[in-house]
Amino acid sequence: GQQEGLSIINPDMVGAVGFSSGGFSAEYGDKMSSVLDIIYKHPEAFEGSVSASFLGATASVGQSTKKFSQLHGVRYKTNSTLLSSLDTKGEYEPSFFDYQTYLTYKFAPKWEASLLGNISINNYKFTPHERNTSFGTATDAKQFKVYFDGYEKDKFETYFGAFSLNFFPDKYTQWALMTSAFVTNELVTYDIAGQYWLDDLANSEDGESTENKGALGVGTYHEHARNRLRASVVATSLKGATKLGQNELKWGLTHQYEKIHDRVREWEMRDSAGYSLPHTGQSVEMIYNLFSRQDMESHRLSAYLQDTYRLRTLWGRFIFTGGLRASYWGFNKETLISPRASISFIPAANEQ
């Protein structure tokens, strides 16, 4: 979690957020897992906000006319102050940057174009110095001390863009042609060696563990990693929605192309009192040694059809949703057909 940057949700730009932990409708996803639906707000006039703290700063600006609206947001975060309070002392240099933009242009009475963009650049550098941790009980206290050499340097870059062309033939129908691209580049590198001592502590008269009774274990370890991930995803979708009385019919077709380049080279060596662990007596082995080279290109096709019926009663509103989703993945030649149905109830008191 030390490398964790900014969430995709920018509170200054988002109008509504929907989340489902599973069992969602056919219009979302090919797997019955969680889904996050973010709706960006449309500024009604010129607006802006600025905030700053010891952990970072944010700024956003929006502007709107009859045909054109724009919304921009910039965020910067650094959690070095929080990380410096951990048991492992050292130089923490994290920096997380995020820029998002949302543009809409209504070039005809029934046509609208929109563009969503996101740039996220996260850097994390850590040079550990030492770690001193005490644990155990009042009668059996231990102390674990480590001195470090080396550092860790990570970089995570994400670029995302989506263009949508919307057509409104009447007030009940909407068509949308969308294309999006996602690119990520992740690099994790570290070489950190540590020399550690595990000591037994004796209790003083006031009950505090201060006196060192002797070393229980002495050793060293070395962690190494050169991991890189490059992935790009390009998707094109055609979607539609129509309201027929109390029913809302939705459908969609999507083609998605994926390209992944993954390299993993990671190992850890441990030496305790002059013996490499695990000790076999015949060879020097690592605690673990990971090596992987993966290159993958694939195509995905998906389609869905969904109907939502709303029934209002004296007690509240019932929402019945049923649909069918079909998907094909070229990587494993697998076709999945997923029927989905759900019933929800909103009490009348909550509607008001």
Predicted regions and their residues:
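Transmembrane beta-barrel wall of Gram-negative outer-membrane proteins
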Residues: L55-Y76, K89-T127, E152-A181
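Structural signature of outer-membrane beta-barrel domains
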Residues: L55-A57, K77-T81, S120-K125, F156-E157, ...
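Transmembrane beta-barrel strands of outer-membrane/channel proteins
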Residues: V50-F54, H72-T78, L115-I121, L177-V183, ...
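Flexible loop and strand-edge segments within Gram-negative outer membrane beta-barrel domains
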Residues: N79, G90, E112-F168, V183-E208, ...
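Surface-exposed extracellular loop regions of Gram-negative outer-membrane beta-barrel proteins
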Residues: K31, K67-S84, F96, R131, ...
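Outer-membrane beta-barrel channels and translocator barrels
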Residues: V14, P43, L55, T65-F68, ...
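Short acidic/polar hinge/loop motifs at secondary-structure boundaries
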Residues: G1-F19
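Outer-membrane beta-barrel transmembrane domain signature of Gram-negative proteins
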Residues: S209-K213, G219, E223-F318
